[in-house]
Amino acid sequence: MLEDFDLDFQPSIDRKLLYDLASCRFVAEGRPIVFLGQPGTGKTFLATALPTAAVEAGYRGYFTSAADLVASVASAYADGNFTTRIRTYTGPSVLVIDDVGLVGFDRAQANALFQVVNRRYERGSSTIVTTNRSLSAWGELFGGDHVVAAAVLDRLLDRAVVINIKGPSWRLREHQALTEAMR
């Protein structure tokens, strides 16, 4: 899957680093990965390709959007199913949380995300996060709770590999190519 990514289109990505990550050593070491960048730059593609390689190597992986994760965990508090539900997110060797900050969180949702990230951090499990937002903006995204945002970032960034993709949108490239072909 990683071989399908056009690194020439996103030259800001370090090829050597990306192929090193595909070796799955980050999973064995419990390292988080944070993909930063504008919409359409390939964050989700890469965040899916790496755990796919990990699953092929025998690890367990799970993919979720940030919105689905916080809704699920926050509702589990209310339902009394927190312990069971959180295992969905803390059990896999690799957890991908896609689009953190695309939609802001209320305080309960911010706390739910903290619970997942903290437990994975304590277990030494790898968490992959994608975000369109700068990390400095996370305090506002977390229901204005800068302390919870700082705690999440503290755990995510400790020993993390941070990949900031600075480049154009794949989707807009495809749109432009289609538009030109139709002329």
What feature does the model see in each segment?
Residues I13-G91, L141:
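Conserved P-loop
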Residues M1-K16:
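Charged, amphipathic alpha-helical linker segments immediately N-terminal to NTP-binding catalytic cores
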Residues M1, R31, R159-V161:
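A generic secondary-structure signal marking the coil-to-beta-strand transition
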Residues F9, G37, G167:
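Flexible glycine-/small-residue-rich
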Residues V94:
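Walker B motif beta-strand of ABC-family P-loop ATPases
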